Amino acid sequence: MRYLSTRGHSAGERFCDILLEGLAPDGGLYLPEHYPVLDGSRLKELRKVYQTQGYAQLAYELLSLYVDDIPAQDLHALCHRTYTASVFGNPLIAPLRYLTPRLSVLALSNGPTLAFKDMAMQLLGNLFEYELMRRGEQLNILGATSGDTGSAAEYAMRGKKGVRVFMTSPHGRMSAFQQAQMFSLMDANIFNLAIEGVFDDCQDMVKAVSSDLNFKRTYKIGTVNSINWARLLAQVVYYFAGYFQATTGHAQRVSFAVPSGNFGNVCAGHVARMMGLPVSKLVVATNENNVLDEFFQTGLYKVRDSAHTFETSSPSMDISKASNFERFVFDALDRDATRTQSLFAQQLQTTGSFDLSKEACFATLAQRFGFVSGCSTHTHRLQTIRDIHRQHGQLIDPHTADGVKVALEHLEPNVPMVVLETALPIKFANTLLEATGQNPPMPEAFKDLEKSPKRFVTMPPDVAQIKAYIAQHCG
């Protein structure tokens, strides 16, 4: 399997090359040259693999389709070392939890940091360490987080050989629990940078540093954000696991509702659907920062600046510039790299928007790719949390509540709807308290977390300053 950039760069890169590189040299995002398509008989085989050998073996089978430069026995060992009951607290790794016979939640938050990001990040940490040791190299990971990516990355990379993590986050815009998870880490290879701005400022800094090829190569800069194909690929696996749990036969269709900010999670669903997984709808659920909902409703993709990005009670979705969206647009435009380059590298940079409403591809988006969307507000998510708690005796976090609210708007007869869980409720205790009048249960391992000493550096959203900081700490 070879990989190409959404903006046209194609030098025959293989998986391990793009694992370490992250962003393509032309500023585009890597995708495989083609998506392997699984027919009904292969889906039936994979269902049996999942039911008899578990999640780790399913991950190995699916990753093998995209990874041919890691020996099979090594990839097998990496998958089985990553997806264990001891790491994820459940032998199913990602169990399905029913709310009603037609509506369920895929529990993705059983990992070390209690968020779905662990599902990919734990594998990424093991892949990085494996490949860096094989090459005898080091990697400096530069990332941006709106809350959960940062802690998932840091817990996956802490103590790993040959890896440093420089994680940017919007200063004061994460929940107290999220901040404590990250800033309490004292490992020598972990550096937390609190940026005076919003998540989009952090993400722009990461892209700017990654686009400086000389700096990137001098300081061996890599990324764990979902612009890294390896992370998105790892997320594809749980769509298959969710499908196999929600159905009994390979011809049945399922819809997935995905709380969305950066478009990485639902983009993995897009890849699974392109591979032949029988997905009816991919439901994009946004919060008040509804840039993606606006696009799927109108064809207009209009990013917002920091001043117009709302601070909400589902903060991990407070994003107005969805970095993974470029991958989907590339596919929607029949992989026209020239057009994708024009839209994202030129038009979006100069005008802050583009409009596909009059193009033939937009009229067929739902039919070809299954995408539908909706928006949820603070009032909606509080009511949804209350309703789920009263009616089903379950607590869900505010992002998952956004997913449930929009999922209910897109139910189809005889098609199971699976909502992808974002995090455990304790990560957003204040919102849960407001909604239900009670604090969510605190896992024993995290009881004194928010009282722990913290280590982080505050800086403005200045690319030169972050480069200087990285250079200073990579000596």
What is the predicted role of each segment?
Residues 1-475:
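PLP-dependent amino-acid enzyme catalytic core
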